[in-house]
Design a protein with these regions (language model features):
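Membrane-embedded and interfacial regions of multi-pass energy-transducing membrane proteins
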Residues: 2-101, 105-391
Length: 391
């Protein structure tokens, strides 16, 4: 059906479509958007990331209705939400659990892209938007910038130390700037993805095999086939999400750290300062380097390295299914290093932990720095002309 045909529909819906082409949008993005037939469990996490972001936005809106920014009011307002606001404890735990859930599904979403080569041409732009989700900047690291660093930190804080001005600025960033940036990046990600089409576990372009009707032979409409699949995945995810939220909201100090249940005291430093668990990888790399400036640079490179994967990978194939043992070995080392660094980042800065972080840091960076060489030398398998359905 063309846009003109949808606009001639009788009644209110036809009137709306004439002014706002809702039918055309739904067809382009859902019913006439063809996705590969062989999506597997790894393709759940994109829709789950969007779901968790919606949970974060709505729970955050309700929290801001009762939260008061300020040195004298912030802690008490959180306690008020937990004890006095009706279902305030539920909203807070929903938001704190959602923060960790968001990074879990985003990391898995990015790992799927690495597995199946979704960053290779023509999907460099969708990959760039997706990899940005994992990037956060610790403000104190600005102090490592030569000459202007200390003054820049003071300007960001708005004071010589953490004060009301700092809390207000961070609150504005957290409530307005970060959500808007994420929404913008997600929209760009989806627009770019629908322009070039989805990748699949085989790394085969379904647009290269079209039927007489001009539609991909190995593709099916996203709706209703994958929307139903995603609804099932959402149901399973929400059961696990609710189990954590109701029975293990702090996840043994991983999701909500114990010191955050104590009022801030500038005269009492916690025994061990740790970042949020999902930044443990980058914090471990930061501590692994003795020099503060070099450590900040190493951490920044560890984040930005994902952006350059489309140009570092010289393999003629996309999917890990058809790559050789060399690439699979480096990928295994990278996964082990990532998990180990995340664990070490939450441990005290003891010499043993710091040394281990340096060892695993080598494994982390070797995956990226040596990629132009081992992907070129690796012996690959023949790639099929059409998608397959093996595990």
């Amino acid at each position: 059906m063309t846009t003109g045909e949808s606009a001639t529909k009788p009644g209110l819906w036809g009137w709306v479509n004439k002014r706002l082409p809702v039918d055309q949008f739904l067809r382009h993005e859902l019913t006439e958007y063809y996705a590969p037939k062989n999506f597997n469990i790894w393709y759940f996490f994109g829709s789950l990331a969007l779901l968790v972001l919606v949970i974060q936005l709505f729970s955050g809106i309700f929290l801001t209705m009762f939260y008061k920014v300020g040195e004298a009011t912030s802690f008490d307002s959180v306690e008020f939400i937990m004890r006095e606001v009706e279902y305030g404890w539920l909203i807070r735990y929903m938001h704190s659990t959602g923060a960790s859930a968001f990074f879990i599904v985003v990391y898995l979403h990015m790992f799927r892209a690495i597995l199946y080569g979704s960053y290779k041409a023509p999907r460099e732009l969708p990959w760039g938007n997706m990899s940005y989700w994992g990037a956060q900047v610790i403000v104190n690291l600005f102090s490592t910038i030569p000459v202007i660093g200390p003054g820049l930190v003071e300007w960001i804080r708005g004071d010589y130390g953490i004060a009301d001005a700092t809390l207000n600025r961070f609150f504005a960033l957290h409530v307005v700037a970060v959500p808007l940036a994420l929404i913008m990046l997600i929209v760009l990600h989806l627009v770019a993805l629908h322009q070039v089409g989805s990748n699949n576990p085989d790394g085969v372009e379904i647009k290269d095999n079209e039927g007489s009707d001009g539609k991909p032979i190995d593709g099916i409409p996203f709706h209703p086939y994958y929307t139903v699949k995603d609804i099932f995945g959402v149901g399973v995810f929400l059961i696990l999400f609710a189990a954590v939220m109701f029975f293990m909201p702090t996840m043994n100090d991983l999701f909500l750290e114990r010191p955050n249940f104590e009022e801030a005291n500038p005269l009492s430093t916690p025994e061990h300062i740790t970042p949020a668990w999902y930044f443990g990888v980058f914090y471990a790399l930061l501590r692994a380097v003795p020099d503060q400036q070099l450590g900040a640079l190493v951490m920044l490179i560890a984040i930005l390295a994902f952006f350059f994967l489309p140009w570092l990978d010289r393999s003629p194939v996309k999917s890990v299914r058809y790559r050789g043992w060399i690439y699979k070995s480096f990928l295994t080392v990278f996964v082990i290093s990532f998990v180990a660094l995340n664990y070490l980042g939450m441990k005290p800065a003891d010499p043993g932990y710091v040394y281990a972080a340096r060892v695993f840091g080598v494994g982390y960076f070797a995956f990226f720095l040596l990629m132009p060489f081992y992907t070129r030398w690796d012996r690959t398998k023949p790639v099929p002309q059409r998608v397959t359905f093996h595990a």
